[in-house]
Amino acid sequence: MKKRKIFTVVLIFSILMATLAGCDKADKVSDTTKKPVIKIGSDNYPPYNFLNEDGIPTGIDVELATEAFRRMGYKTEIVQINWEKKKELVESGKIDCIMGCFSMEGRLNDYRWAGPYIASRQVVAVNENSDIHKLSDLKGKNLAVQSTTKPEGIFLNRTDKRIPKLGNLISLGHMELIYTFLGKGYVDAVAAHEESIVQYMKDYDTSFRILKEPLMVVGIGAAFAKNDDRGICEQMNQKLEEMHKDGTSLKIIKKYMDDPEKYLEVDDLGY
């Protein structure tokens, strides 16, 4: 009789454990289905997107996007892309959106935007011993930019009267190369986001001089395809505004840059 009772108890316990295990698996499957993945296209652009010592994508844009999409019920995947093909990739659906210190200025009608969530200065940097001190001193000089970026357009189009005619505008595929060209003396100056230049100097223990006169102050946003009507862009915009108000954005930016408050002065950009 005792053996039968023991057997019955063991059997009930086994059934209970199997049931709980099944529920746990079901919960995990359910949790996965609740977390669709958003693919974010970016190139290497410290401090916005770069690989840490463990080879994991990190940076301002990575953290902001991860938190915004977490609040929306999504997981994020950072996809390293050829920056020159970003528009083609987002329009084809191979990525869901473009981030990576992406300027909204002059591109408002090209994409569906979430942002601006950061205000950034486009600036010119030179070697410390350079005789270039203001934008007009760039006349006849050689300047390097990353291809398809806002500085490239500024110097190609020269719609701003302050921008002189260069000797040569050299467009390079990767951001790191423009700093190498400047350090080696292949060019007289480079133009990029101020944060990128400052980060490069920290990472490589080098020193450039940034001109006080900026090329432009621009808003940084996340770009979706123009015909993307899923509503994800609009939801992300709401979450980014929420993060701005509750201090989350400030906390993230503070990890990477000094004087983080100035980068959140987006209300006067007019977008």
How would you name each of these model-derived features?
Residues 66, 75-137, 209, 214:
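Acidic, polar ligand-binding/catalytic clefts
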